[in-house]
């Protein structure tokens, strides 16, 4: 259906897609090892790539897949060694007519092999200027600027054109240099290893090199490992990275196993060490650093450690003395049965109630004290980068025992948390005292901590170095060799100078490690393994990390006596057994350990379970019978209370991230894919694929796959006998056994290799130099993490809030302040990090390499990619003028103040107080201006509260926000409200609190202060609700704050007052131009009576979930935030809550309702889909879309005349000729941010972060840039919409309707106070979720019991 817009020349709209080949067929062959050898496929892939860089080969578990395009000859392992004489287990071919939305396995494997081949040749041709980094390539420059990431994504369009998209992204990555390594640098930079992109942590070399030829080594450098040569050869053969073995420097690093297994580390604790502390040796040239968002180069090491004042030093000494004194009241053999908070009690009295932690509060610069409220906050301290790590890791290297399985440590991530300021709750273990100290730099109430400007941290535009990569004019001499010019410097090795600085014991004197208070011989986990036995280390682990008995109270740390437990002969208290998590669909519990020994009937949930093939009327979401990619398996990796068996632990392999295989939704995938062999660049693992070639309508999303993947035994079966019931190794495990466990866990078995007669190592030695002596770091060559698993930004100083199970209202308060802020908080200084396309290219390493690999390299334009481009009508909204309800165009919001418009659904009255500790006079003026503006615009009436005669009206001025003063203020508020209560409807009471800085730390702190007051008031007056509004102090004190700004602030206040669902306006429903009678079944097939919208997203670390709901007009609107943490059932509870909200919204509509389920970030995991399956019923039809405004697809506008307003910007004098004064009344005033066009693409696109799925229809809402020219084209602002299913047959019509609905909801952004006029192409509910997710992920949350 080609319907191009007549007014726009689509040939002038160019994309970042490049056509490579015209495909008639793709040939494939599958090879399996004869003897089930674990290494055969790995070796064949490496050897085949080494021999011919253009071969298309891919590895899946033990299977080797080979591909060829059109009539090219299929590659075969026999080409490497004819003596192998292997035959293909399966052969075939496929075309571009593949099934959607789930891609068949062979198609995804083909894309994976294609991308690997392109990256391999790019890296090799660039001579290490490009290095693969995750599923991208990092462009290494020779200056100190950040290095952009080059990302290439292949796609086979339905018109048989094989194309790739090329884009760049700047994460601020810098190569790690020896002379830049110091504790201050490590505490503010996250490290990653290439080519995998896995998060790592640097370890100081503790080996004694004195008297050896290694004396010159830097303290972080280690000698060349014995398998270093093998690793370098493997790097070159598999990735094209060529390092000089004579000049290569090596470092000891701790890889984050959770990240390796496909789950991003906790963003709010991103600088904390992982629980698994095993090390590997890696080339320094392949380690990169990403700066924290709040990095301050002027911060000294003493400031980072919080020891720059004499008072803080004395406080630490005093705490230590108090610890010694309190130890006299602890004796082994005693027990207690109470844990809780002991406030206001002498902690040294043996007669009072005791806690599991003695809480001591030293003096604080800000005089902040601990609060007894359920929700509190504390900015964390920034301790040394890895506190106590020199005591934890004292061995030279731990390569033999490096395991792929997740850590069995039962301790939480708090083991190495950074903490700061006076509210810190140390919940590490009962052996640790709470030492709350205020550290300079985090005084959120007073002094301002300097931070690097956002513009310096992230760059949205493509740097010159990336432009040169594509051969543009301004070429750098250092990179000239990339673009065909001669350059003698072809290696690019690092010759960094050795640093003289050292990290001493004094720097890490205050360790947050549990073992710091334990005997010296137990302080090192690896001591026993270092001496040939793991007994000592595992005993230490059993004691410190595994789940403890007796209410988690250590015997030697219980008090001498307790009034709460006085019977010395009674048995010790026993924990209440935890309920096993039950499936949403199956009433029977299922233990995966015994899966192979049970009936299929019970394995699938019994006779009452849902059948995977069950069909429903409205939406047929057929689901695989095998285990889904769920948060349960992923959360088990970081669970602190329950240790799962090793098989369950391995379920944490990536399920829903881009380009990771672990979807496990085809039969027995969890048994056939070793986690160590599951590489990121499997292109998102299509392996939840639908039936090949199946086209049973457009609602066959997530069909039961008929996989082509052979069923192989789980690699875990070979080591079942060596795994304990708790997932730990027995004490008798030797280092050789540990090595065997390790290699099996990654599917690498030297033992099997040597015992296999078909692969005699003696016979083939010399042919395959990679088959023996696998380095322990080999698994990190097999995985490539997607960029979606690396946060765009992170902070090394994160605020902390504490909530309990019954009251987490502070989270909703924070979300409300973030969303409805009219952008006066400036996104809390957290920048966007967009993907950027390449405007132009000429002869360079990319073009030359692609030209050498494929038959063409032609840029695609709109004539090929776009089916329809059309302007969208601006919707109308309802408002009141005097006493009449009128309709206006939605883009006239900024003229509301001049037209004396009123809210459509009535006024909202409130009374308020401004609570401040500075700028008293400015606040008084602010109160006057705010109240006058609110009343003048007829939003309602507002009353200034005066609690005492000494106070100014509407103002409470405190020198500081001590908890005692806040409680006194709460008592005054209670007294005032009790005295002045009326018999009528209560007027809402709001507190306005200014913030000195617009950052997440101060926002969290001020919200927690309000929570103290709110809890106290509600305790006395349960029916009283308090409301909060955070306003920047710059807004209050600035003389440039305009009346328009006050108007916007008043409207945002109106929108959050009760009833919160009532906003200033809503979309006015248009009278249809024609009536459609439902006289036939076909006419009513795709006609819905109402649409409701649900937008949601989960954070990349799976810690948070956000949702917003709306009807088509915005009359009904809700939003909610959930902190999931590491809980196994919180995700299901959140989904249930969302389900209830959606059903309640649908229940207010009549007739046939379509629920448009919108998932952000271009991804849809299986565990989420299983929950949403319930949302489809007889009267509710589910349309699933994935959306994102930051995609890897870009369009550049070269048209200078469309839209017509471009000419006004190109020539300011042209307005005199273009505008006719005599027809001035015929012109309309337009807001260009609201000038939106709809786009429906000719071919569907794959999801940006789930390349295993492809839309059945793709479209977008776009905005044109007013300053674009033919020579300087600008990219379109684009909100991409991918439709994944269609409840009826006309997907084109449904997508058009969804785009229209989204465009209407986007018009409410500025009216709801979500934005100040920007992002007019993003629907309000999507933008609300995006704002919450962008900011709240940087907040630590502790759940109080």
From Swiss-Prot:
Residue ranges with Acidic residues bias: 469-482
Coiled coil: none
Native source species: Candida glabrata (strain ATCC 2001 / BCRC 20586 / JCM 3761 / NBRC 0622 / NRRL Y-65 / CBS 138)
Keyword Transcription in annotation: yes
Location of the protein in the cell: Nucleus
Description of how the protein assembles with itself and partners: Component of the SRB8-11 complex, which itself associates with the Mediator complex.
Described purpose of this protein according to its UniProt entry: Component of the SRB8-11 complex. The SRB8-11 complex is a regulatory module of the Mediator complex which is itself involved in regulation of basal and activated RNA polymerase II-dependent transcription. The SRB8-11 complex may be involved in the transcriptional repression of a subset of genes regulated by Mediator. It may inhibit the association of the Mediator complex with RNA polymerase II to form the holoenzyme complex.
Pfam families: Med13_C, Med13_N
GO MF term list: cyclin binding; transcription coactivator activity
InterPro entries noted in UniProt: Med13_C, Mediator_complx_sub13, Mediator_Med13_N
GO annotation, biological process: negative regulation of transcription by RNA polymerase II; positive regulation of transcription by RNA polymerase II
Protein name: Mediator of RNA polymerase II transcription subunit 13
Region ranges (Disordered): 363-387, 402-537
GO CC annotations, alphabetized: CKM complex; mediator complex
Ranges of Polar residues composition bias in the record: 406-415, 486-501
Biased composition range(s): Low complexity: 364-375
Gene field: SSN2
Family: Belongs to the Mediator complex subunit 13 family.
Domain of life: Eukaryota
Keywords recorded for this protein, A-Z: Activator, Nucleus, Repressor, Transcription, Transcription regulation
Span of the signal peptide: none
